Regions:
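Extended, solvent-exposed segments with strong compositional bias
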Residues: 135-147, 205-260, 277
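Alpha-helical residues within the helix-turn-helix
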Residues: 42, 59-60
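Short, cationic-aromatic polyanion-contact patches
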Residues: 15-21, 36, 69-92
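Short beta-strands within extracellular/lumenal beta-sheet-rich domains
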Residues: 145-166, 249-253
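Amphipathic alpha-helical dimerization/coiled-coil segments
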Residues: 84-148, 152
Length: 319
């Protein structure tokens, strides 16, 4: 998913999509699961030079990714559509003026219960051996940039350093996820639960464990028949409810947690044993997948208003 956080940020994207031929390029690439430049130029009946200009515009705004693949006559450039969807924040976020930004490295979980197939790795090497849950306690796991398991959970503590005397109004969590199948399987659904302080706020069904092409940032040493990339998901919980990629998925609101400057905030990602689709979970961090990021978190906060302050504000409004 491509997340555009303001209309100004999306200007180059809007320009790139404001062309019939570039829309046609995207449609052809989706229909053919990617295509090399020569084939694409032939399909469109345009020169390679003209195509290169269009591809560059789509690549610059994150719509298309290009990989070099071996062919009978040397390497060739193959184009793929990068995001599965585009999320654009149109509504002004001015009411959330105070934002605390942080991130969680994939290996910084504080609790876990996982089952094989499973494993953990940094961007440089595997940590221990696959399918051995003991390595989820190895000291090197703090350096992990990817982890996967068939069912169970990992739990993180979100750093909470908002100023004294403030409450939390909204939490936004952005991370790259997919299922965990034996090998790879694009059709391997998995129901992934998101929990805050052990309270389920949302469930997202991952469609599969993706490996049809190498992840943009996945290291060269990574086995080609292992999961290569995931889907970027943006989870938001505020006073209106819980949202994934801009769509409301539950009525659970931030108000139910009464979170403030001294609250402990636990984030659990779980594939429950009794879920409809028990298809595992893979979490991608920096150095893996299609999005070079760890678990990114934004916390919006505002001053705690006492009952006396509220009464004063209401009286002022009346007068």
């Amino acid at each position: 998913m491509l997340h555009i956080k303001s209309l100004d940020d999306g200007l180059e994207l809007f320009k790139a999509l404001g062309s019939e031929i570039r829309i046609e390029i995207i449609k052809i690439l989706l229909e053919n699961n990617g295509m090399n430049m020569n084939e694409l130029a032939g399909k469109l009946k345009i020169t390679n030079g003209a195509l290169t200009n269009h591809i560059r515009k789509l690549e610059d705004c994150g719509i298309i990714s290009i990989s070099n693949e071996a062919a009978s006559h040397g390497n060739q450039k193959k184009c793929f559509v990068h995001p599965d969807k585009i999320l654009i924040d149109i509504e002004s976020q001015e009411k959330y003026k105070n934002i605390y930004k942080t991130n969680l490295k994939i290996g910084h979980f504080t609790d876990f219960k996982v089952y094989p197939t499973c494993g953990i790795a940094s961007s440089n090497a595997l940590i221990g051996e696959v399918d051995d849950i003991r390595y989820f306690t190895h000291p090197d796991r703090y350096n992990a940039d990817i982890l996967w398991f068939a069912k169970g959970y990992v739990e993180y503590i979100i750093p909470n350093f908002i100023p004294f005397g403030h409450k939390i109004d909204q939490i936004t969590i952005s991370l790259e996820l997919c299922s965990e199948a034996p090998g790879i399987n694009d059709v391997w659904p998995s129901d992934i639960s998101f929990k805050i302080n052990d309270h389920k706020i949302a469930v997202w069904t991952s469609p599969g464990d993706f490996g049809n092409v190498r992840g943009i940032f996945t290291p060269d040493w990574w086995y080609p028949n292992w999961n290569q990339y995931g889907l970027l998901k943006v989870l938001v919980i505020n006073e209106k409810g819980t949202f994934i990629d801009g769509l409301q998925v539950s009525d659970v609101s931030i108000n139910e947690f009464s979170l403030d400057y001294h609250s402990t905030i636990k984030l659990k990602l779980e594939v429950e044993e009794d879920a409809k689709h028990v298809g595992g979970l893979t979490i991608f961090g920096k150095g893996f997948g299609n999005y070079n990021q760890d678990i990114d978190i934004h916390i919006n906060y505002s001053p705690i208003i006492s009952s006396g302050d509220k009464e004063t504000e209401e009286n002022s409004a009346i007068s």
